């Protein structure tokens, strides 16, 4: 029934290497565009919820705590799915898996729309459909990473993955425009248009994506990327292959027993409190506390994503200039985040609000990218998916969930850790950023030792 998700591996064509290399580009670009556009579209049917919050409050009388409960459902299933669904997808045709999951997620969001009537809602159905949507979206990043890794040479993989990484920034930045167009032009200003229109787009993108590309050049008889581009298999990968380690053995040895991965997991928890805390509540804070218009509030949300796009491209490059010191560069960004949060909290006018959100997007997505890049440096290629999965699971189950429900309760006036109101919300954001700095500083020390150790080995080999 789901045979289209199985991997296809054809015998290598009896053609010269340079001919097969020329044949590589077209199917690669098809596959690359499918995962890029597919992941971008996932954000259109995820971030529209953030855009619609003020209208859901005014139309249906939902409280911030209830909105937080809906978001919590997504966070839990997304977090669990990051490990479970990604583990299942490993060994499947990941290029096909992503658009299939996009289609299922879009169907769930249509169900979410149906749970909102003319003037009433079913909170249970809203939580259920949004949670299912999160479960299906959870493997989007892992499938994209797996597909691109199988297609590209190591020396250019960072460029391709770095550019792919802006897909979710573009999706987040475009979510407001797509959602508002659906509501204002297709549904006479009703909030359900913010969910139905993006879902229809996602269905179209998903079905088209199933028709183009595949997860590896081996699907076309072109051979492995290493063979096509004259690269040796890395030492870490050779070790796992020579020992014939199973996926579970690799997961235990290189992830569960890896203290750096655990430090990065907890760093990611704190970072997600900051990132999702800003992302989830910026429009509500601007409208309720700063007394700005809904239009300006949404502009700030969009600028946060635009700043993230720029930051995603720049911070990785800066860490390369620092000779791979990802954690150290992340600490610099985190220190700047704390200072900028103060400006955002006390924004005196809309221009300060907009500028501070752009700056926060630029800064927050630097450490998010660098935590992932740092993790890659401490595991073999076969463990990257597992490391990314467990890191994401912790971030969403704890960090994302607290940012949505915990911060929502604090803003509503419910004491959490002795914090109440918007002042308490910002105190929690500051504390999370400080916690992330402390953990990343520990990673920076271990990263420095690794860099110096590898440098000595390289000097010995040259001598």
Curated annotation (Swiss-Prot):
GO terms for biological process: glucose-6-phosphate transport; phosphate ion transmembrane transport. Gene3D superfamilies: MFS general substrate transporter like domains (1.20.1250.20). Its main location: membrane. Keywords: Cell inner membrane, Cell membrane, Membrane, Phosphate transport, Sugar transport, Transmembrane, Transmembrane helix, Transport. The keyword Plastid does not apply. It is a multi-pass membrane protein. The keyword Membrane applies. It comes from the Bacteria. The chain crosses the membrane at residues 25-45, 61-81, 97-117, 123-143, 160-180, 190-210, 260-280, 298-318, 327-347, 358-378, 383-403, 426-446. It holds the Pfam family MFS_1. GO terms for molecular function: glucose 6-phosphate:phosphate antiporter activity. GO terms for cellular component: plasma membrane. Residues 46-60, 118-122, 181-189, 281-297, 348-357, 404-425 are periplasmic. Residues 1-24, 82-96, 144-159, 211-259, 319-326, 379-382, 447-463 are cytoplasmic. Induction: External glucose-6-phosphate induces the expression of the UHP-region. It is found in: Cell inner membrane. Mediates the exchange of external hexose 6-phosphate and internal inorganic phosphate. PANTHER family: GLUCOSE-6-PHOSPHATE EXCHANGER SLC37A4, HEXOSE-6-PHOSPHATE:PHOSPHATE ANTIPORTER. Belongs to the major facilitator superfamily. Organophosphate:Pi antiporter (OPA) (TC 2.A.1.4) family. This is Hexose-6-phosphate:phosphate antiporter. It comes from Salmonella typhimurium (strain LT2 / SGSC1412 / ATCC 700720). The gene is uhpT.
């Amino acid at each position: 029934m789901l045979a289209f998700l199985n991997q296809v591996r054809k015998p290598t064509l009896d053609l010269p290497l340079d001919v097969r290399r020329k044949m590589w580009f077209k199917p690669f670009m098809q596959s690359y565009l499918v995962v890029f556009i597919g992941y971008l579209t996932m954000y259109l049917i995820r971030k529209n919820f953030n855009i619609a919050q003020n209208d859901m409050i005014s139309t249906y009388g939902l409280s911030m705590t209830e909105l937080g409960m809906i978001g919590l459902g997504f966070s839990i299933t997304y977090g669990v799915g990051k490990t479970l669904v990604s583990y299942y997808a490993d060994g499947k045709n990941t290029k096909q898996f992503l658009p299939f999951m996009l289609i299922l997620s879009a169907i769930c969001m249509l169900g979410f729309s149906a749970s909102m009537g003319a003037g009433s809602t079913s909170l249970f159905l809203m939580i259920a459909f949004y949670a299912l949507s999160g479960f299906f979206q959870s493997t989007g990043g892992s499938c994209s990473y797996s597909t691109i890794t199988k297609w590209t040479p190591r020396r250019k993989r960072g460029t391709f993955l770095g550019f792919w990484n802006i897909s979710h920034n573009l999706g987040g930045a475009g979510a407001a425009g797509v959602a508002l167009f659906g509501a204002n032009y297709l549904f006479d200003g009703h909030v359900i248009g913010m969910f139905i229109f993006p879902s229809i787009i996602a269905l179209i993108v998903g079905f088209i994506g199933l028709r183009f590309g595949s997860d590896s050049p081996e699907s076309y008889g072109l051979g492995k990327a290493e063979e096509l581009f004259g690269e040796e298999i890395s030492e870490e990968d050779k070790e796992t292959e020579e020992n014939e380690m199973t996926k579970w053995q690799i997961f235990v040895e290189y992830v569960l027993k890896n203290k750096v991965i655990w430090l990065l997991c907890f760093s990611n928890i704190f970072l997600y409190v900051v990132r999702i805390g800003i992302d989830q509540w910026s429009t509500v804070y601007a409208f309720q506390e700063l007394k700005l218009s809904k239009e300006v509030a949404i502009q700030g949300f969009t600028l946060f994503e635009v700043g993230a796009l720029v930051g995603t491209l720049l911070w990785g490059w800066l860490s390369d200039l620092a000779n791979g010191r990802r954690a150290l560069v992340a600490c610099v960004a985190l220190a700047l985040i704390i200072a900028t949060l103060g400006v955002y909290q006390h924004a005196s006018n809309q221009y300060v609000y907009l500028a501070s959100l752009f700056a926060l997007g630029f800064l927050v997505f630097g450490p998010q990218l660098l935590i992932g890049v740092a993790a890659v440096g401490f595991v073999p290629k076969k463990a990257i998916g597992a490391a990314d999965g467990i890191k994401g699971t912790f971030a969403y189950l704890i960090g994302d969930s607290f940012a949505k429900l915990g911060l929502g309760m604090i803003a509503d006036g419910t004491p959490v850790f002795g914090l109440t109101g918007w002042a308490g919300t910002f105190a929690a954001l500051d504390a999370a950023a400080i916690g992330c700095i402390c953990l990343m500083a520990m990673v920076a020390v271990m990263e420095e030792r690794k860099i110096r150790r590898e440098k000595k080995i390289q000097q010995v080999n040259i001598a």
